[in-house]
Amino acid sequence: MSKGHSLQDPYLNTLRKEKVPVSIYLVNGIKLQGSIESFDQFVVLLKNTVSQMVYKHAISTVVPARPVRLPSPSDSEHGDSEPGNA
């Protein structure tokens, strides 16, 4: 995985594992709400009443409903650090 994902993947994975409600703002201004079901290099699956596949290139901002603590680098060596796995 490229270095550009060193913050993005753990952040999205923490939001997914803790089922944190998020607001996702798209580049066109649309606001989507739900929880992150899964993600990969190109898309995020957002679950609310339905699941929506949102392309990352269309995302401007991800806003969690509550503060999120990112795992330290040593934490990822011990746990499930595989991106997107539910």
Curated annotation (Swiss-Prot):
Q: Which residues form the Sm domain?
A: 9-68
The Basic and acidic residues compositionally biased stretches are: 75-86
**What's a single GO CC term here?**
cytosol
Q: Which GO terms describe its molecular function?
A: RNA binding
Q: Which CDD domains match?
A: Hfq
Cite the PROSITE patterns for this sequence. SM
**Start and end residues of each stretch annotated as Disordered:** 66-86
Query: Is RNA-binding given among the entry's keywords?
Result: yes
What keywords is this UniProt entry annotated with?
RNA-binding, Stress response
Which GO BP terms, alphabetically?
regulation of DNA-templated transcription; regulation of RNA stability; regulation of translation, ncRNA-mediated
Instruction: Give a yes or no for keyword RNA-binding in this entry.
Output: yes
Q: Pfam family of this protein, just one? A: Hfq
What the protein does comes down to: RNA chaperone that binds small regulatory RNA (sRNAs) and mRNAs to facilitate mRNA translational regulation in response to envelope stress, environmental stress and changes in metabolite concentrations. Also binds with high specificity to tRNAs.
Subunit structure of this entry? Homohexamer.
Query: Record's family?
Result: Belongs to the Hfq family.
Q: Which NCBIfam families match?
A: Hfq (TIGR02383), PRK00395.1 (NF001602)
What name is this protein filed under? RNA-binding protein Hfq
